[in-house]
Swiss-Prot record:
GO terms for cellular component: I band; plasma membrane; T-tubule. GTP binds at residues 87-94, 195-198. The lineage of its organism: Eukaryota, Metazoa, Chordata, Craniata, Vertebrata. GO terms for biological process: negative regulation of calcium ion transmembrane transport via high voltage-gated calcium channel; regulation of skeletal muscle contraction by calcium ion signaling. One of its GO terms (molecular function) is GTP binding. Most highly expressed in the endothelial lining of the blood vessels in uterus and heart. Lower levels found in spleen, lymph node, kidney and testis. Also found in cells with secretory function such as the islets of Langerhans, lobule/duct epithelium in the breast, bile duct epithelium in the liver, surface epithelium in the endometrial glands of the uterus, colon mucosa and acinar cells in the pancreas and the prostate. NCBIfam families: small_GTP. Belongs to the small GTPase superfamily. RGK family. Residues 35-55 have a biased composition (Polar residues). Residues 63-73 have a biased composition (Low complexity). This is GTP-binding protein REM 1. Gene3D superfamilies: P-loop containing nucleotide triphosphate hydrolases. Keywords: Calmodulin-binding, GTP-binding, Nucleotide-binding, Phosphoprotein.
Amino acid sequence: MTLNTEQEAKTPLHRRASTPLPLSPRGHQPGRLSTVPSTQSQHPRLGQSASLNPPTQKPSPAPDDWSSESSDSEGSWEALYRVVLLGDPGVGKTSLASLFAGKQERDLHEQLGEDVYERTLTVDGEDTTLVVVDTWEAEKLDKSWSQESCLQGGSAYVIVYSIADRGSFESASELRIQLRRTHQADHVPIILVGNKADLARCREVSVEEGRACAVVFDCKFIETSATLQHNVAELFEGVVRQLRLRRRDSAAKEPPAPRRPASLAQRARRFLARLTARSARRRALKARSKSCHNLAVL
């Protein structure tokens, strides 16, 4: 029996259908399968489509973030400020807010909420919109985080006490300390208001005490009477002027240059200057006590 080895060597081998084809390390060829992925992807991966993941956009500022310190000074909210009324119950905060709202002039004010009022005032020929918030008592009774946000979300603060209630005056001093802790680096105007000046016979807090408190805590001072509508307009016009002055003052300030270490001679001069500065401090304190009731100056 003769084996045709030469004929078998020339003819290609026939494989069964179940026999796998050899893997090719090269690219795709007709009739063969390739397990090597293509270097150029024809379609983006799932979850990476540009239509499914649009570029992120910054959220629009909330109304609570409206402030005179906004970087967009040319925006439509430049002259809108949030004024927060603080103080014990019964000192006249709601009466002052109602007079600000001008209930006799419905076309000049808009009530945004139960205790929130908005009104545009023309002071020194320039329009400024104030949003007066009288929600301190509701937030205090609620004992929630909103009371803390009330101390942080104002463009200006009006601390009200009654001249016929020394306890409310002491509470006003405590509120001023809380505001100082909350706004340590902020240039926020704070006005101390002695309301119910019409109750002169029941007075427990003198004008001198109110001024001294304003000087110590670096704020403005004014006495009002919501019953007689005395100094109420001057109060809110003063708030507008203080906001403008603080805004201009903070804009004019430049970051300080880095200080060099002082020499021995410079330190000696500073020490001698401190020894002789007591009279100057007294004069400055006296000047501040004279100007603390002037809401048209810093």
